[in-house]
């Protein structure tokens, strides 16, 4: 029970903590991006909570967005492109793509658990029920990732019970 839960969370923290750190928006998703401005650059909103964080965090926020679902092949392709560019500019070194993608996925688990909590709080405390419609996509991300990695299976079992699936 609790022991497995703690082990899984410690593992998730290890994967997040092992990543190179740089500027992270922390809320980099579709609803915080504006169509390209006159300059041709997109407008980026809600950046006041930016921090120094794991290199894959904003990528997870964008590719496993709470509001838009991308096909898995698109996610893999874009993650690979990001990894290649990050290596070229020196953000990532000595890390093959499969290791980077695992870090990306574990970072996603942390982010998606946080989002489930935030959306639930917004509904229960603030009566903002519109976020509930996005929970199934977040659950889908969590269930597929926790199924894919053996180390996350204990969390998957907890999620199965909690989500009544």
Where are these predicted regions, by residue range?
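ATP-dependent phospho-/nucleotidyl transfer catalytic cores
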Residues: 1-26, 34-38, 42-45, 133
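Hydrophobic packing residues in well-ordered alpha-helices of helical domains and bundles
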Residues: 2-5, 75, 109, 131-135, ...
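Secondary-structure capping and boundary motifs in well-ordered enzyme cores
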Residues: 20, 25, 51-55, 101-109
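Activation segment
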Residues: 36, 42, 50-52, 68
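Amphipathic, non-membrane alpha-helical segments in soluble helical-bundle scaffolds
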Residues: 49, 72, 102-109, 128, ...
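Active-site activation/catalytic loop segments of kinase-like enzymes and analogous catalytic loops
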Residues: 56-92, 106-125, 138-145
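Histidine/acidic-rich helix-loop-helix segments that form or flank divalent-metal centers
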Residues: 93-102
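ATP/Mg2+ or Mg2+-diphosphate-binding catalytic cores
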Residues: 117-165
